[in-house]
A protein has these predicted regions:
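Single-pass membrane-anchoring alpha-helices
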Residues: 1-27
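Parallel beta-helix/beta-solenoid repeats that form elongated, surface-exposed shafts/blades used
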Residues: 20-207
Length: 207
């Protein structure tokens, strides 16, 4: 009888010790910080698959496909890159901006994009660029396949302050353009495959 009691006691004690050990191990993995300084943070799955990178400009990787960088390139931004279940880049949030040796503002803006599976091109893009060479603020939707990337929808405004919605055909040619100029004049233009306006609607003057 005593032997059975000792066996049961030993089993219970072993179970409790194991539970406390596992709980202590799990608790040790959770740490709290008020502030962290880092050049780059990699987020990985338990099997090591890369899922997200938060990085400064110097450490931002090139395009990574299935865990391999092809090839390393210098991207003039800092930001956050997203990777799918296979460790292939499929979007990101990047930002930058500085003055070059001539005092011109270059690479200034922010871009949130998502890539189509199996293609290193963006099919959804929310961009804001404002530097010495370019100014664009808008939402861009594109078709992507083996033949390239073709813009289909643009909603935004340009450096002249014209707000517009552009609808393109499957070849990326603009076919419908809705615009409102800075002075408030609206218009709808219909274009042929060569980009020529074939019909246009504007405001009707009151009599």
């Amino acid at each position: 009888m005593l032997a059975k009691v000792l066996v049961v006691y030993s089993a219970v004690l072993t179970t409790l010790l194991a539970a406390f050990t596992l709980a202590g191990s799990a608790a040790a993995r959770v740490q709290h910080f008020d502030e962290i300084d880092a050049h780059r943070i990699n987020v990985r799955e338990p099997d090591g698959t890369l899922r997200m990178v938060i990085s400064n400009h110097a450490r931002l990787p090139g395009v990574i496909v299935r865990g391999k960088e092809h090839p390393p390139v210098d991207r003039p931004y800092a930001g956050m890159l997203f990777y799918n279940d296979e460790g292939t880049e499929n979007g990101g949030l990047v930002f930058g901006g500085h003055r070059n040796a001539n005092g011109e503002v270059v690479d200034s803006g922010v871009n949130l994009s998502f890539d189509r599976y199996g293609a290193s091109s963006q099919f959804v893009q929310l961009a804001g660029v404002d530097d010495s060479r370019n100014h664009i603020v808008g939402l861009i939707l594109s078709d992507t396949d083996a033949t390239g990337n073709r813009r289909r929808v643009f909603i935004g405004h340009d450096k002249e302050g014209v707000a517009s919605v552009s609808l393109m055909d499957c070849n990326g040619r603009k076919r419908i353009l809705l615009q409102v100029t800075p002075d408030g004049t609206p218009s709808i233009s219909f274009l042929d495959a060569d980009g020529k306006v074939v019909n246009q609607l504007g405001p009707t003057r009151s009599q």
